Amino acid sequence: MAVRSARARRLQTVLLLALIVIGTGLLLTRCPANRDGMPGQLAQAMTETTSAARSGASALDMWMAERSTAQLTSVQLSDARDEVINAYEGIAELRADDPADIARQQMLTESMTSIIGTLNAASAAVRGIASQPPADRVRNDLLAVAAELERGYR
């Protein structure tokens, strides 16, 4: 009986280790940066950028509908800008070898720069700086750039 229980414990240990290894492998393959290399990193940065642009547009929607304060909207716009900056930093120094990746990286960094500028203009509009375009135009610009980025990236 003792031999059988020792064998069962060993088998249990081996199965547990196998499950941990398989689980870790599955977790790593779900991450696009690990699964797809540079294309995955670029796709992730594109997703983060379009999400941030849409978050900024949503913050402006709430502010224009008077459902949010100028201070909260400014914080949300700053957070969206920071998300784009972090995504930019993640891909700006990547060294692409594939012409398609080089083109995507260039298009993505140009779009990110445009979105950062638009988010800055949105923040200025919320703060009431007269030389900035109206908030509804900035909101539409954010949504248009996000949609164009998604269309152009594919």
Predicted regions span which residues?
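Short, Lys/Arg-rich N-terminal segment immediately upstream of the first membrane anchor
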Residues: 1-9
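Transmembrane signal-anchor/signal-peptide helices with a preference for the extracytoplasmic
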Residues: 22-43
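Alpha-helical segments in soluble extracytoplasmic regions
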Residues: 41-123, 132-152
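Hydrophobic membrane-insertion alpha-helices, especially the h-region
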Residues: 10-28
